[in-house]
Every structure is written in C-alpha cells, then in structure tokens.
Amino acid sequence: MEMVNIKINGMPLSVPAGSTILEAARYAGINIPTLCWMKDLNEIGACRICVVEVVRAKTLVTACVYPVNEGMEIYTNSPRVMKARKMTLELMLSTHDKKCLSCVRSENCELQKLCRDYGVEDVDAFEGENPQSPLDETTLHMAVSYTHLRAHETELHL
C-alpha cells in the first residue's frame, strides 16, 4: 500500500494514499467533529463542521471528503477553523426548531455538545420554539428523511 507523509497540527504522519484528512486524523487520534458524515454511505461534506485549514489552500476544506497529498500540512484547530465552525453552528441554530428540551435526544445530541464545545451559548437556542420556522415537526422530519434518502441514493447509485 502506498503511503504519503503529511503533518496534522505539526505532528508528522505516514498514512495510506487516498485517505481523507478525517481518516488520517482519526488514525492519529486527532478529533475532527462531524455531523453529516457516515463512513461509506454519506461522505458529502454538507454540514461543514469538519472544516480544516490546509497550508497554501485558498479556503478551508471539508476533512471528510478532502484527500491527503504528499507533504500536506493541516491544522484542525486554528483560530480560522474555530471561527468557521462556530459560525456554522450559529447558522444551524438560526433555523433549528429549538424543541431541544422535549427532544428524545436532549443531552445526548451532537449538535448540543458541539455548541457547548465551541462556545455557542445562546440560551434561547436550546429552549422554547422558533416562531419563525415555517416547518412543523412532521414536515421537518420528512425533509430530513428525504435529504438523507437522496444522499444515500446518490452514494449507492440508485
């Protein structure tokens, strides 16, 4: 198996060619958060929580889909990355239905955990309801299910 040499947060690593940045980081025990990623099923980089900084890249890249290259230098927690993840979480919450206290996943929710980790502390984000949301719970569930179904169909070439 061909290997490539990279650095993640200054740590030199040798990882299989063709690996994604996320796979390389996990191999090294480095956590990169994800919300939408599911190995071999949903690798589309849609949520953008897994963004990382690659030296000489013009923009942040999604670690779950971006392949490693020989000599690549990656930073998973630079100020730029942390700011982008926080902004992404804030945008997600701006359209969130905010029924977290009555949700079956309350306190076992990756979104809540990430908001705490990244200092998104808007108390209203986890209480009450979003009166501006045009979607009721049934419509929202259908929309999420449809989005996941379409992603899976694309991955499975159905």
Task: List PLM regions with ranges.
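Eukaryote-biased recognition of intrinsically disordered, low-complexity regulatory segments
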Residues: 2-9
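Fe-S ferredoxin-like electron-transfer domains
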Residues: 48-52, 57-150
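N-terminal cofactor/phosphate-binding cores enriched in small/glycine residues
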Residues: 13, 17-62, 66-70
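A generic secondary-structure micro-motif detector
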Residues: 11-12, 101
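Single conserved hydrophobic/aromatic residue that forms the stacking wall/gate
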Residues: 148, 155-158
